[in-house]
């Protein structure tokens, strides 16, 4: 299994519309496809390795970020105008902004905003220099590649182009965030706190390397057992807020909501990693079942093929109640349950200050 890479601290930058043609999973089809599946499933009315029964399964962190595989190409260039995070003067006063706008707003405007499918970021403004900055975390090779693999004829195992990384650049695009989303002040911090946050962001970015679309739990109830947590743009924002609160930031009392995509299943079954499933001594029947499940999610050449694949996905997930999840570079089987999949826009409050000695302000 190859994993795309190349988003270390020196590669941070602003997303853009530059394009390199490649095997990118077309978002203009799979975004409405997810919505269709969510609507359709809402209308439709095991034993693994005991040592792995820690729920939710902890997100695995790594000691380094691997280099990108040339096969993995993004339609929209990752972070093309990025810059290193600047060192602020300790006595500077930094305003912190909550930024939120519809996913793919640059292409579809407010279309996905009406469905509350939002992208999250953080803005900063230095009082001393009057410079603005944007910081966000997102997929290197677009959402489809982070969610589903490529089935390459020359490879036995599915091939994943899944990485996410931090992006930092000077400036805040007011129109982008205000027109169809949110740009609001949530906290004020010192330059010293900002510098400590920057060191934490670098470490977080170097060790948390892959994107996870799904939150998987037993039911829609708030107290339901959670099997897997997502790891996406909103989780990066929430982690950063928590770090700032730990450093002493005092957040305003305002409502903050975030998009989440849920899968609902019974207790997952651990299947193994790439070698144990797809290697020479692997389970060929299981390997074939996993590849058969992922086959309908491949890039499509025609509308007819795309619609046929939607029916195959519905049959697998809803009728046969099966889903194969790739998490921490390991495969899991999810025995799906009604309502199967749901997209929500939930409130997650801003954190309370952890440290009452706010030095430098």
Curated annotation (Swiss-Prot):
Catalytic reaction list: S-hexadecanoyl-L-cysteinyl-[protein] + H2O = L-cysteinyl-[protein] + hexadecanoate + H(+)
| The keyword Hydrolase appears for this protein | yes
**Biological processes per GO annotation:** glycosylation; lysosome organization; positive regulation of GTP binding; retrograde transport, endosome to Golgi; signal peptide processing
Q: Where is this region: Disordered?
A: 1-24
Catalytic residues, per the record, are 119 (proton acceptor), 233 (nucleophile)
**Modification after translation, per record:** N-glycosylated with both high mannose and complex type sugars. Glycosylation is important for proper folding and trafficking to the lysosomes.
Q: Which UniProt keywords apply?
A: Disulfide bond, Glycoprotein, Hydrolase, Lysosome, Membrane, Neurodegeneration, Neuronal ceroid lipofuscinosis, Signal-anchor, Transferase, Transmembrane, Transmembrane helix
Site described as Cleavage, located at 45-46
GO-annotated cellular components: cytosol; lysosomal membrane; lysosome
The residue ranges for the Cytoplasmic side of the membrane come to 1-30
Question: From which domain of life does this come?
Answer: Eukaryota
Which cysteine-cysteine pairs are annotated as disulfide bonds in the entry? Answer: 72-161, 79-167
Q: Any idea of its EC number?
A: 2.3.1.-, 3.1.2.22
- Per UniProt, the ranges with Gly residues bias are 1-21
GO MF terms here are: D-mannose binding; hydrolase activity, acting on glycosyl bonds; transferase activity
Q: Which residues are glycosylated?
A: 132, 145, 180, 205, 257, 273, 283, 355
Q: Where is this region: Membrane-anchoring?
A: 306-345
- What disorder is listed for this protein? Defects in CLN5 are the cause of neuronal ceroid lipofuscinosis (NCL). NCL is characterized by brain atrophy and the accumulation of lysosome derived fluorescent storage bodies in neurons and most other cells. NCL is found in New Zealand Borderdale sheep.
- State how it assembles: Multimer. Interacts with SORT1, RAB5A and RAB7A. Interacts with PPT1, TPP1, CLN3, CLN6, CLN8, ATP5F1A and ATP5F1B.
UniProt family annotation: Belongs to the CLN5 family.
**What is the recorded function of this protein according to its Swiss-Prot or TrEMBL entry?**
Exhibits palmitoyl protein thioesterase (S-depalmitoylation) activity in vitro and most likely plays a role in protein S-depalmitoylation.
Protein name as annotated = Bis(monoacylglycero)phosphate synthase CLN5
Organism in which the protein naturally occurs: Ovis aries (Sheep)
Gene designation:
CLN5
